[in-house]
């Protein structure tokens, strides 16, 4: 009898790490991969996020491990405190709530509330501008978005969402092309009043703007704004033919509606 107890205890000690690891695992779905901008890597069955800013990840392995990042996110929102960190990741909170996780109450975030109040979103419109020969980065046109406003009157009071490279503005055309093709620039999202965009593209550069309304549900619209807030604090490597304005907007829409898998259709290149 004592021998059987010894065997049982020995097996328990041997199996416990595996059991604990299995319990710690949380299934990573397409929604989480899209929310973290994770793409299949070139080295087998692994992932890497297109986001390069360290402040976007809670786990030290977060850029290359969506599972580790998911566990770190669950831990963050399951406990009290860390309000400042939580306020940077409202879309992740919404995602976890939708999956049924028991979480602590989301904190009051004044800057996030002001962001929503400034936008007063009522819809999202995809915009495409004509090519502009005086700017090498706009030779194929430019893709951006407009967050339509619920305010009465003109959409000039809406806000535009733009992804672009952060350049010094003083580079010559050759250096600009080399850096743009090889990832020499960082890129990021900016939100600005739509009348500024109209003034630049229509009035100054004399470019046409084509509009395509997106059929987002109210829940998807809210999630889009929340995720835009998240990635608005981040940067990515900018590549003219791959990680450009069109591609990053597709990744953002995939986060809202993962089943679209828009970015999957452009594994090699995406023309702006």
Show which residues each predicted segment covers.
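N-terminal accessory/precursor segments of enzymes
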Residues: 175-246, 256
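Activation targets extended, charge/polar-rich intrinsically disordered C-terminal tails
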Residues: 22-107, 212, 227-272
């Amino acid at each position: 009898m004592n021998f059987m107890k010894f065997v049982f205890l020995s097996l328990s000690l041997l199996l416990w790490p595996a059991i604990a690891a299995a319990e710690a695992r949380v299934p990573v779905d397409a929604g989480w991969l899209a929310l973290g901008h994770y793409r299949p890597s070139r080295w087998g069955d692994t992932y890497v996020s297109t986001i390069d800013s360290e402040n976007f990840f809670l786990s030290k392995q977060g850029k290359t491990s969506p599972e580790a990042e998911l566990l770190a996110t669950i831990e963050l929102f399951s406990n009290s405190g860390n309000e400042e960190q939580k306020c940077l990741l409202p879309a992740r909170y919404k995602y976890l709530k939708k999956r049924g996780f028991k979480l602590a109450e989301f904190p009051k975030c004044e800057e996030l509330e002001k962001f929503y109040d400034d936008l007063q979103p009522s819809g999202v419109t995809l915009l495409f501008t004509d090519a502009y020969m005086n700017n090498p980065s706009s030779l194929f046109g430019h893709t951006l978005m407009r967050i339509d406003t619920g305010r009465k009157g003109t959409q000039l009071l809406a806000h535009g969402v733009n992804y672009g490279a952060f350049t010094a503005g003083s580079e010559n055309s050759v250096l600009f092309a080399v850096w743009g093709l090889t990832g020499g620039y960082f890129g990021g999202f900016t939100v600005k009043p739509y009348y500024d965009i109209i003034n630049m593209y229509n009035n100054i550069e004399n470019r046409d703007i084509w509009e395509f309304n997106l059929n987002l549900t109210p829940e998807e619209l809210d999630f889009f704004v929340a995720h835009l807030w998240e990635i608005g604090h981040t940067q990515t490597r900018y590549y003219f033919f791959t990680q450009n304005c069109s591609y990053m907007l597709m990744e953002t829409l995939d986060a809202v509606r993962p089943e679209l898998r828009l970015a999957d259709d452009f594994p090699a290149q995406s023309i702006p």
